[in-house]
Amino acid sequence: VSIFGAMFAPKPFDVAKEMVRVTRPGGRVIMGNWIPNDPTLVAQILKISSAYSPPPPEGFISPMTWGVESNVIERFGAAGIPKDKISFVRDTYTFNFPYTPPEFVAAFRRSYGPTMNAFDAAEQNGRASDLQRELEALFDSQNKSPRKDATSIPATFLRVTAEV
């Protein structure tokens, strides 16, 4: 099981192969992967953050490509899993945070790698306050909590099941 984890490892074909290798025959590999260009929170955080970050190194494969069914089929196929043994469900994870959206942005700034990197780059370019404003506007716009002192934001992801 890898929920929003293995998708961030480099070399996605090696990742799929290793997950299959360590799963016993008859077992399942289950992944939760963020979806590129999705209008919900995480894809939008990454989109905003990328505008403040330096370009990725040559050969970089975006972790978001794990949210594209054809890529997942290709990767697990190369690891020996036939297409008919791979299934997909779009699902929702709701971020519930007992503080305001700006405080939730601060938590992402402290603990979520892509956001941390974007703020590091934005600070070097004197644009950290712009990034902060954009992320706060995003979090505010997607917040579904009826309370002003809480944040509740649904985010869509692709649940992948590969039968080994």
Model-derived features: where do they sit?
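A short SAM/SAH-binding and catalytic strip from SAM-dependent methyltransferases
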Residues: 1-13, 35
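Short SAM/SAH-binding signature in class I
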Residues: 1-4, 30, 156
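A short, structure-level motif marking secondary-structure boundaries and short turns
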Residues: 4, 56-59, 144
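A structural feature recognizing the 12-helix transmembrane core of secondary solute carriers
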Residues: 7, 20-21, 152
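Conserved catalytic/acceptor-binding region of the Class I
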Residues: 13-14, 20, 24-99, 115
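Class I S-adenosylmethionine-dependent transferase superfamily signal
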Residues: 18-19, 162
